[in-house]
């Protein structure tokens, strides 16, 4: 017979949600930083051809 799982506590749910949000925040910050460096031409990790 199937037994229902215990309910996840609110605090645990909040902690997991914050971790998930924090990961997204850092990824978006890195992406924004990379885009900024590409647009200004200061990128050291990408070689972008400039149209003359």
Swiss-Prot record:
Entries under Pfam families matching the protein: Ribosomal_L32p
Keywords, ordered alphabetically: Chloroplast, Plastid, Ribonucleoprotein, Ribosomal protein
GO term, biological process aspect, one: translation
SUPFAM superfamilies hit by this protein: Zn-binding ribosomal proteins (SSF57829)
Disulfide bonds: none
Subcellular location: Plastid, Chloroplast
Any GO molecular function: structural constituent of ribosome
Keyword Disulfide bond recorded: no
InterPro entries assigned to the protein according to its UniProt record, in alphabetical order: Ribosomal_bL32, Ribosomal_bL32_plant/cyanobact, Ribosomal_zn-bd
GO cellular component, one term: chloroplast
Family membership: Belongs to the bacterial ribosomal protein bL32 family.
Record protein name field: Large ribosomal subunit protein bL32c
UniProt source species: Aethionema grandiflorum
Source lineage: Eukaryota, Viridiplantae, Streptophyta, Embryophyta, Tracheophyta
Gene from which the chain derives: rpl32
């Amino acid at each position: 017979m199937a037994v229902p799982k215990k309910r996840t506590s609110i605090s645990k749910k909040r902690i997991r949600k914050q971790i998930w949000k924090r990961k997204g925040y850092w990824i978006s910050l890195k992406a924004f930083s990379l885009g900024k460096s590409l647009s200004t031409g200061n990128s050291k990790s990408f070689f972008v051809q400039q149209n003359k």
